[in-house]
């Protein structure tokens, strides 16, 4: 199966909600999460998918096909991997309120060092079998966003994200949206032609079926199933071919899971 995770940027809005704060390279050269405890102390460990999978594969190497781990679909507006690498943090222009607060709370913030640290983590991850895809720079709904806006958005991704994570030919659409119908992409699809011209060849949406794949001479298109708390709570039967939800559901999790 193809394993992916969206939005591994540790956005500002996630602060204080029990999420890790960033990915780091520890003293052993391994990629781990930094986690800020309630008392402000910092712990380092397996607190999100990337280090959890890395640790699991060490114990079960047959789980990984030719050393591959997964694909991370990345935006850029809040930076990447927990590092505040977008140009707005350097220029101080067009900042959102949470970005302003971050800079106010970190008067010693060093943009150049932040980018350097993010590159170090990305390099270590790629060496361990992780790959990166575009998730659009601004988490855009590609179906609802105009072509001109998507062009501006992709330009930002290539300018501010690609130098850190590397170039990619994969785009995993935010919101599970898509740029065409199930029938396939055609030459008169302007959004597809644009992304094709920018070097993208692998396109992923979200689909509830067990598998949805289209392969042509020009592109590979695949649906993804969201393995999250929402799907586990409301539609466990859709995941039954993968695992028994009752065996992995954490009983301490508050229910009902909020609707969408």
PLM segments and residue spans:
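Metal-dependent polysaccharide deacetylase catalytic core of the NodB/CE4 family, i.e.
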Residues: 1, 9-180
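C-terminal active-site subregion of NodB/CE4 polysaccharide deacetylases
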Residues: 1-3, 10-15, 127, 142-260
């Amino acid at each position: 199966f193809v394993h992916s995770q969206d939005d591994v940027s540790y956005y500002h809005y996630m602060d204080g909600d029990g999420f890790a704060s960033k990915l780091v390279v520890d003293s052993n050269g391994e990629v781990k999460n930094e986690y800020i405890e309630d008392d402000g102390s910092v712990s380092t460990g397996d607190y999100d998918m990337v280090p959890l999978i890395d640790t699991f594969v060490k114990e079960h190497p047959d789980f990984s096909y030719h050393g591959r781990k997964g694909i991370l679909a990345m935006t850029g507006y809040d930076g990447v991997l927990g590092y505040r690498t977008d140009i707005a943090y350097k220029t101080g222009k067009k900042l959102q309120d949470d970005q302003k607060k971050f800079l106010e709370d970190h008067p010693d913030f060093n943009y150049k060092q932040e980018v350097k640290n993010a590159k170090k983590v990305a390099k270590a991850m790629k060496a361990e079998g992780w790959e990166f895809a575009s998730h659009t720079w601004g988490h855009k709904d590609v179906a609802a966003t105009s072509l001109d806006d998507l062009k501006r958005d992709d330009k930002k991704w290539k300018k501010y994200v690609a130098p850190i994570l590397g170039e990619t030919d994969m785009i995993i659409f935010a919101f599970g949206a898509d740029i065409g119908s199930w029938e396939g992409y055609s030459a008169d699809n302007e959004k597809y032609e644009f992304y094709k011209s920018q070097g993208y060849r692998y396109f992923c949406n979200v689909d509830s079926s067990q598998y949805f794949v289209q392969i042509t001479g020009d592109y590979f298109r695949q649906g993804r199933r969201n393995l999250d708390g929402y799907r586990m709570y409301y539609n466990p039967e859709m995941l039954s071919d993968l695992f028994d939800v009752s065996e992995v559901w954490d009983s301490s999790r508050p229910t009902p899971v909020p609707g969408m």
